[in-house]
Swiss-Prot record:
It holds the Pfam family CBF_beta. Keywords: Nucleus. GO terms for molecular function: transcription coactivator activity. GO terms for biological process: regulation of hemocyte proliferation; regulation of transcription by RNA polymerase II. Its main location: nucleus. The lineage of its organism: Eukaryota, Metazoa, Ecdysozoa, Arthropoda, Hexapoda. Belongs to the CBF-beta family. It is found in: Nucleus. It comes from Drosophila melanogaster. This is Protein big brother. Regulates the DNA-binding properties of Runt.
């Protein structure tokens, strides 16, 4: 089987003929978010379940001893990442956050000091086309805790602006392509009409006299 990476770099071999229709020179990039994020967050059954506080567990290194898992969990948090799962739904999350432990920060994303024996975590990401925030805590010994997903209004507005701009640019390029295609079609009709007139007069251009000799 051909290597997928090689396939990704392959370019179709197209030869453009005299009257071949011009190809579109743009690709619509898949958007990161859906058009109405808040509505989906409030109506989607999965989001409705995950928006309620429920049990979460650390899921990393399950085959290792509890002592080693505790160490790896704390080290991962200090590096700014961890793995967690909502027990009731089985939804697994790869959480990434700012692990800065500056005591003067008022809104830490990873806070070992807020409550003894626990780490409080906030992580921002896009899930199923919706900007959300994980908020919860995990016990440093048991490696379980409580968490939920919240709708991230600020980042949703930012991503929505990007989406609108992306759609506007796509529509503009689509209009430009349609104009080019229309101009090509009009030129093709003019050329074909010129050919028909040349044939009706007994030849095409200068070459007509050659055929009459």
């Amino acid at each position: 089987m051909m290597n997928e990476a090689a396939l990704a770099n392959m370019i179709p071999y197209d030869t453009i003929g005299l009257y071949e229709q011009p190809k579109p020179r743009f690709i619509f990039k898949m958007p990161r978010v859906v058009p109405d994020q808040k509505s989906k967050f409030e109506s989607d059954e999965l989001f409705r379940r995950l928006s309620r506080e429920s049990e979460v567990r650390y899921t990393g290194y399950r085959e290792r001893s509890i002592e080693e898992r505790q160490v790896r969990f704390m080290n991962g948090c200090r590096e700014g990442h961890t793995e967690a799962s909502f027990v009731a739904s089985g939804t697994n999350l790869q959480l990434v956050f700012n692990a800065n432990q500056n005591p003067y920060l008022h809104d830490k994303e990873c806070d070992f000091d807020k409550e003894h024996g626990k780490v409080h975590i906030k992580s921002y990401f896009i899930m199923n086309g919706v900007c959300v925030r994980f908020r919860g805590w995990i016990d440093l010994e048991r490696l379980d805790g409580v968490g939920c997903l919240e709708y991230d209004e600020r980042r949703a507005m930012h991503e929505d602006a990007i989406l609108r701009d992306q759609i506007d640019r796509y529509n503009q390029r689509l209009r430009e392509f349609e104009d080019t295609k229309r101009a090509y079609r009009d030129n093709r009709q003019d050329e074909m009409e010129a050919v028909r007139r040349g044939v009706a007069s007994g030849g095409i251009g200068v070459g007509a006299s050659m055929w009459r000799r």
